[in-house]
A protein has these predicted regions:
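Conserved segment of winged-helix/HTH DNA-binding domains
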Residues: 2-3, 11-12, 33, 74-94
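Beta-hairpin "wing" of winged helix-turn-helix
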Residues: 62-71, 78
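Key DNA-contact positions within bacterial/archaeal DNA-binding proteins
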Residues: 51
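Short capping segments at the starts of secondary-structure elements
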Residues: 22-25, 34-38
Length: 94
């Protein structure tokens, strides 16, 4: 494999691992529909604790699938505008 092929393969692997969970898929679908939401909003919709929801959002953030913004005491999440092609391609399928 060439270096560019290896890089693309690793990027797809990272994105697929981040999305290989029904809760994280639900988060991405929710954010796709609503543009942005707080951790509390997302936790309520996917029926999960704030702590568990934050963990899932952290995984999505680490994979550059979502971005976050601190507003006052709340963290707001939205789909990343700078997604890698692998993440963008998969999100288009959802």
């Amino acid at each position: 494999m060439t270096n560019s092929t290896t890089k693309i393969t690793k990027e797809f692997e990272r994105v697929l691992k981040a999305l290989a969970n029904r809760r994280r898929l639900a988060i991405v679908q929710y954010l796709k529909k609503h543009n942005e939401a707080t951790v509390g909003d997302i936790a309520e919709i996917i029926e999960l604790s704030l702590k568990a929801t934050s963990k899932h959002l952290g995984i999505l953030f680490a994979a550059d699938i979502v971005e976050r913004e601190q507003r006052s005491l709340q963290m707001w999440y939205s789909l990343s505008l700078n997604q890698k092609p692998a993440a963008r391609g998969i999100n288009n399928l959802l």
